[in-house]
Amino acid sequence: MAPGASAPAASRSEDEVGQKIDRCFADSLLKVTGGVAIGIVASVAFFKSRSWPIWFGSGVGLGTGWSNCRHDFASPYVLHGKRVPAGQDSQGKPAYNIITEQHKQ
């Protein structure tokens, strides 16, 4: 290792939980926003500007965001990163490595 360079810090469980919470909020916000947008379009185009499609779309978005969050927290070993081809295994099937993103502090 070069002088002055520090070793990469080990990932703490608090940091991993924080990243999962951040990803959960971002995903839920995106899904709720998409549901509201689809609800607005459906309300204007098909339902004579009634408000229930907007509420229905936001509920569907919130429900899918909640479901994704539960799945993310229930499977602690899921790695979020890029899948990079690494050749083939002994049976001739493609093998992949998962490269996770390192957050700089």
From Swiss-Prot:
The species this protein was found in: Caenorhabditis elegans
Main function: Component of the MICOS complex, a large protein complex of the mitochondrial inner membrane that plays crucial roles in the maintenance of crista junctions, inner membrane architecture, and formation of contact sites to the outer membrane.
Transmembrane listed as a keyword: yes
Subcellular location: Mitochondrion inner membrane
Family membership noted in the UniProt record: Belongs to the MICOS complex subunit Mic10 family.
Annotated transmembrane regions: 29-46
An example Gene Ontology CC term for this record: mitochondrion
Lineage, broadest ranks: Eukaryota, Metazoa, Ecdysozoa, Nematoda, Chromadorea
Region (Disordered): 85-105
Protein name, entry field: MICOS complex subunit Mic10
PANTHER family: MICOS COMPLEX SUBUNIT MIC10 (PTHR21304:SF0)
Residue ranges annotated as Mitochondrial intermembrane topological domain: 47-105
Domain of life: Eukaryota
Alphabetical list of InterPro entries matching this protein: Mic10 (IPR007512)
Keywords: Membrane, Mitochondrion, Mitochondrion inner membrane, Transmembrane, Transmembrane helix
Complex formation: Component of the mitochondrial contact site and cristae organizing system (MICOS) complex.
The keyword Ion transport appears for this protein: no
Membrane association type: Single-pass membrane protein
Record Pfam families: DUF543
